Amino acid sequence: MQATNQTFQKMYNRALVLRHVRRNERISRVDLSRALGLKKSSISNIVAELLEAGIISEREQGESSASGGRKPIFLEVNRQFCGFLGIEVQPNRYNAVFLDLAGRVLFQREGKVSTYRDGFEPSLEKIYEELAPLAEQTGLPVAGICLGVPGYVHPADGTILYSIPHGLENWRVSPRAQPWDVPVYVENDANCCAWGELMVHPNSGAVDFLSVLMEFQEENPRLQQDIGISTGFGVVINGSLYYGQAFNSGEFKSALWTRNNKSQVGIPDEQLLGIRENQDILDDYLTELLMNLSPIVSVMSPQRVVLCGDGRNLLPRISYLLESRLSDRFIGLAAQRGLFQPSIHAQHNVAIGAAGRLLETLFDQPRIGRSRYEMGVDWEYVLDRFSVPGSELV
């Protein structure tokens, strides 16, 4: 037991150092010791191992202190160590990004697929085939893949529990279809948007916010409703994504919805078919959505509500409705403090968040009882596979 505890403590301290180096671009060994409360000798040993493995690197020297002495050497995460592939897979299209270890987008690719015509896995194989040469050009090894899809998803075991757009039920993602022989994970598309926001604000601590993914639907024979709009939520509490007991947190149904409605709201289905062309229908939909958000915002008190997907472009209209129709409602009053914000990721929300989930969970602190690869690749896997040959870091 003592050996096990010592091993875990070593992994924990290593993760602390890596997490802190990632969050602070100009930090020295002395700064790490002060910030983390670890002995200088422990920091020196951990840093030496990470340098040998190639996962961090030394950059320019800082200025000497007033009392003289050696100039501090700053540390940074080696961006060229490995990368993560995030892919949004919709029935008619895909959007992919490749992130390095610092979270920079190295390439982005959009393409056409037809999962309802060709099948989901054959469509994935086509996507991988198109992305393989782009990933190779970066010179970085692919360490993991995360797929962002619409529907109910078990994020830990890679199962799409139920996806109407893709026609899938209890479908387990297979790593065999991709050429890199790396773990493949799956995440709900709205939750991916939340992961993307967490990646952008790694120093924000225990934040509470909602990500709202709104997308105009394209024609799809598998959809219960031909063309319309869909909305999903990602819920972040105390800096962590909230999934709910059945992994369906964030699946939206309006208080005005009835069982005969194929959509998510109380507006008749036949009216929603014209939502793109008819401003009045769009306003009615947004008003109903905002009215449903009002008690959630009142109870949860989130710091922000981030609009993603097509919702990002609807912010001016949402602001207008909050200032006119809903000005005397709680949601209208709450919006006056800048509650609603557009995501900075534009149309790449889901793909960046999918890759961001792997990046964020990699730099998360290890927990006793967490299974290997529970939510993403861990340092044990990454170091074992990609560290500099001959290094002894385990």
Whereabouts are the PLM-identified features?
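Short glycine-aspartate micro-motif
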Residues: 74, 84-88, 142-146, 209-213, ...
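Short, acidic, Ser/Thr-enriched surface-loop or helix-capping motifs
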Residues: 100, 155, 236
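Short glycine-rich anion-binding loops that position phosphate/pyrophosphate groups of nucleotides
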Residues: 150-152, 215-217, 311
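Glycine/GP-enriched mid-protein hinge/lid loop-to-helix segment characteristic of carbohydrate kinases
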Residues: 108, 119-120, 174, 182-284, ...
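Glycine-rich phosphate-binding loop and adjoining helix at the ATP-binding site
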Residues: 105, 110-208, 316-332
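ATP-binding/phosphotransfer module of carbohydrate and carboxylate kinases, centering on a glycine-rich
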Residues: 1-60, 66-69, 74-112, 116-126, ...
